[in-house]
Amino acid sequence: MKILITNLGTTVDNIASSSILKRLKRRMETTNITWCVKNKADKNIFRYNKSIDKVISLEELMILEDTFDLLINLDPFLPHKICNKVKIVDTLGFGFNEEVNSFESVIKGDKQMKGMNIFQMYYNLAGMTWKGEGYDIGYYPRSKSKKTRAGVAVANANLRNYLTDEINLDSMKLWHIPFKKNIFKKMDEINKCSKIVTDDMLTLHLALSLRKYVYFLRINETNTKIEFFGNGEIYEVPKKVFE
């Protein structure tokens, strides 16, 4: 069975939605999966993913001549006329299933869905029920983890003093996680630590994919419920920190 999955969202959107690959591969072992991202640079996200047979950009999809048994559209911004460039037998997701169109405002950031995590949302879009599956990135870090090291990836300067005053890290050595544009180099840095403190959603998801314990410093409400898989907690940052 040939499946085309489209997600033109952010790196976080693609990493989280990769979870559906686990179920698709289990249900249909002979499945051939093509995943479409927005830009050619985004294709790197799935560089090591063996569950995907081919990764293409939106530009490449526009000129693609192929036939797919199923299209799973995970992005409300996908121009539907683009899909007409290829032959599709069956469809799921945005634009094809009215029951899931309410998720559009969640992905756009206009609405919150506190009772549902991001995995449940993507599984619903793909016509499945989430049963605890995690991420499917396919990369295994080259670095070694140290139990005595806590990684800090905090972009907001006001939070740096807050985290040392409010979060008990059991006298662990603080390790600054440097900014890395390449997500795999970022994962190598994250993997050096056993616990992670961050206010960044990408760092949060990458750390959870590596089964790290995460302290997430939440400044604003998130659009979906954060699923820690038992490995983390949220610290609601009070407004006085920024006064």
Model-derived regions, located:
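Catalytic machinery of carbohydrate-active enzymes
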Residues: 1-243
